[in-house]
């Protein structure tokens, strides 16, 4: 595989293998349930698509889009505000929801989304993330399925971006940016 940018932290082959494993586990856990797969755009789009194909049971699919305002900078300490800008189109009342995220860093976005989805009265809500940065967690959130735990590095590729670029990389690469805003 040709390297387009950066130093890979997770290769395309490693991601494919892990997503197959997650798909098998989710298939087992959700068999016989009224199941809705909810992706968080834009970052989770690549992971979401590959994971959906790896899940071998009938499901509904839907998406949310969120916007973070006032992202916390390392220097300012200003807390960010999470806002849902595109709502679900599926009615999730009484259904089992699996929220698909690209990365869980502080936990703020996931916490906000789980609370928002809970107001729609689903039967259950679980969280699956491609990447987890446990060292950055400031909010204790339940993550039911984790693709990879990674160190506190800014990563791009496979849906994750820097200024809307690099989402198309087929692997995850470290981007070295001193003093940049939080990733989540």
Please state what every model-predicted region is.
Residues 1-184:
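PRPP-associated nucleotide enzymes
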């Amino acid at each position: 595989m040709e390297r387009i940018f950066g130093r890979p932290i997770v290769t395309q082959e490693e991601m494919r293998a892990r997503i197959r494993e997650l798909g098998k586990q989710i298939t087992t856990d959700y068999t016989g349930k009224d199941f809705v797969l909810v992706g968080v755009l834009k970052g989770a789009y690549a992971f979401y698509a590959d994971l959906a194909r790896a899940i071998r049971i009938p499901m509904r699919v839907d998406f949310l889009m969120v916007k973070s305002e006032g992202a916390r900078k390392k220097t300012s300490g200003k807390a960010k505000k999470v806002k849902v800008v595109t709502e679900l189109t599926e009615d999730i009342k009484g259904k089992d929801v699996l929220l698909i995220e690209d990365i869980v860093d502080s936990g703020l976005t996931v916490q906000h989304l789980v609370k928002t989805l809970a107001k729609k009265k689903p039967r259950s809500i679980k969280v699956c993330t491609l990447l987890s940065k446990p060292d950055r967690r400031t909010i204790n959130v339940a993550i039911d399925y984790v693709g990879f735990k990674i160190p506190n590095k800014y990563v791009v590729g496979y849906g994750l971006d820097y200024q809307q670029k690099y989402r198309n990389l087929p692997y995850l690469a470290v981007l070295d940016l001193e003093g940049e805003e939080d990733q989540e």
